[in-house]
Amino acid sequence: MTSPRVNLLDFDADQMAAYVAGLNEKPFRAKQLMQWIHQRGVSDINDMSDLAKSFRATLLDKVEVLSLPVIKDEHATDGTRKWLLDVGAGNAVESVFIPEDDRGTLCISSQAGCAVNCRFCSTGRQGFSRNLTSGEIIGQLWFAEHLLRNDPEAIRRIEKYPTPGWEHTGRVISNVVMMGMGEPLLNYDNVVSALRLMLDDRAYGLSRRRVTVSTSGVVPMIDRLAQDCPVALAVSLHAPNDALRDQLVPLNQKYPLRELLDACERYLPFAPRDFLTFEYCMLDGVNDSDIQAKELVRLLRNIKCKINLIPFNPFPESGLKRSSAQRVNAFAGILLDAGMVATVRKTRGDDIAAACGQLAGDVVDRTRVRERDIHSAEIEIAEVESDVQPNEQPIEWLKKLT
């Protein structure tokens, strides 16, 4: 019986070196393979011309360079591009490329589905299927980078607005954010293996400042990441107190805000920048009041951070609404007046459901949570009187979503 082929995308630099050594080849062959695969985007062993013919013959019988099959390739009017990728057994994940004037950002997935089940995120609606392998994670970058290098539209844009690395390496993707489907820190080993490849000069050579892991707050893994591979960290916060965050981000019930913020402060000395990012999805009448803005200031004022306010991207089953632009600006104004650094994220790719919180996979619904009668639920939000303490704000309406 023929042994299954080894997918070389599954190997980081150390694993590649060990594999090559196991074939009784010299160490420099591992570097050659890394460069052919990750820097040049070559998947056919026969095209790796500076490898010895005997080595190529050995590899042809044992290995492959296999990225995920593409189910759908969608283009948004703003230049954003989304790929639906097949990970087998009826599962799919999504990757999104976001072109900007000074960078090209790829948003990648770490899991098929997500178990965290944040109330405002469509990915959580489908439940959790499995972790992606390191090859499936890095394969999203491999596929997108080398496809875009040969895409006339992408080349025209990048020649007009060069991204970091373009002139010297021909690299289209300058930034990677792990903000796609899944909770990266619940797939820790595979994510870290993929991160190391992104940073490795023999592969993609990205700066730690340009690679971001977004987490909803897996406290023990934040501490491990600080030691193992400290890239930029973004924390999905979305609420200024435990009572509300318990409802919006159920993981908060296991790792409440005080534990999460303590972990963030421990991470800061290892971070590639001198600040962390906190993401805050703006939900109409839920977490966007002046009182909650002031509470957020009190919560974060002693942490070096940037607060990224994200307009909610609606999907039918959520029962939630996006805060108005006026409310977002007023909320941001309170943060800025208090001396906080705050930005409002520009929504991209709405027309192809590629915006933040919209990635759900165009696949068979495998939701493992109770059926929710969301469509008919009327959200009743009690008026918050001026003498009500922030941590006493009513959250009964959220129980209709569970």
UniProtKB/Swiss-Prot annotation:
InterPro entries recorded: Aldolase_TIM (IPR013785), Methyltransferase_A (IPR040072), RlmN_N (IPR048641), RNA_MTrfase_RlmN (IPR027492), rRNA_lsu_MTrfase_RlmN/Cfr (IPR004383), rSAM (IPR007197)
GO cellular component, one term: cytoplasm
Subcellular location: Cytoplasm
Predominant subcellular localization, coarse grouping: cytoplasm
Highest rank taxon of the organism: Bacteria
Single GO biological process annotation from the record: tRNA methylation
Keyword vocabulary terms for this entry: 4Fe-4S, Cytoplasm, Disulfide bond, Iron, Iron-sulfur, Metal-binding, Methyltransferase, rRNA processing, S-adenosyl-L-methionine, Transferase, tRNA processing
Disulfide bond residue pairs: C107-C356
Radical SAM core domain sequence ranges: 100-351
Keyword flag Zinc-finger: no
Miscellaneous comment text of the record: Reaction proceeds by a ping-pong mechanism involving intermediate methylation of a conserved cysteine residue.
PANTHER family: 23S RRNA METHYLTRANSFERASE, RADICAL SAM CORE DOMAIN-CONTAINING PROTEIN
Function: Specifically methylates position 2 of adenine 2503 in 23S rRNA and position 2 of adenine 37 in tRNAs. m2A2503 modification seems to play a crucial role in the proofreading step occurring at the peptidyl transferase center and thus would serve to optimize ribosomal fidelity.
Similarity field: Belongs to the radical SAM superfamily. RlmN family.
Protein name: Dual-specificity RNA methyltransferase RlmN
Organism the protein comes from: Polynucleobacter asymbioticus (strain DSM 18221 / CIP 109841 / QLW-P1DMWA-1)
Organism lineage: Bacteria, Pseudomonadati, Pseudomonadota, Betaproteobacteria, Burkholderiales
Name of encoding gene: rlmN
